[in-house]
Amino acid sequence: MKTLLLTLVVVTIVCLDLGNSFSCYKTPYVKSEPCAPGENLCYTKSWCDAFCSIRGKVIELGCAATCPPAEPKKDITCCSTDNCNTHP
């Protein structure tokens, strides 16, 4: 009986994968980092600034609890799997 209980505990821990948190790419370093508890979405924001014709769009990557609201002249996309917001 003890063996069965121990087996169930081990299987539960493996299935839950305790300690594994949700991660997204974040700027400014564009590296994968764990998100805060409750932040289960990754987002990508992009927009043109005064230097857009020289260096391209400004990119912001990060985690969010909800998808950031739409903003004029900003492209915003959200996704819900680990590291799904790769640099465009």
UniProtKB/Swiss-Prot annotation:
- Where in the cell does this protein reside? Secreted
Q: Does the keyword Ribosomal protein apply?
A: no
**What are the protein's GO molecular function terms?**
acetylcholine receptor inhibitor activity; ion channel regulator activity; toxin activity
Q: What is its main location?
A: secreted
Q: In which tissues is it expressed?
A: Expressed by the venom gland.
- List the Pfam families hit by this protein, alphabetically: Toxin_cobra-type
UniProt cross-references to InterPro entries, sorted A to Z: Snake_3FTx (IPR003571), Snake_toxin-like_sf (IPR045860), Snake_toxin_con_site (IPR018354), Toxin_cobra-type (IPR054131)
Q: Which residues form the signal peptide?
A: 1-21
Tell me the function of this protein.
Binds with high affinity to muscular (alpha-1/CHRNA1) and neuronal (alpha-7/CHRNA7) nicotinic acetylcholine receptor (nAChR) and inhibits acetylcholine from binding to the receptor, thereby impairing neuromuscular and neuronal transmission.
What is the recorded name of this protein? Answer: Long neurotoxin 31
Native organism taxonomy: Eukaryota, Metazoa, Chordata, Craniata, Vertebrata
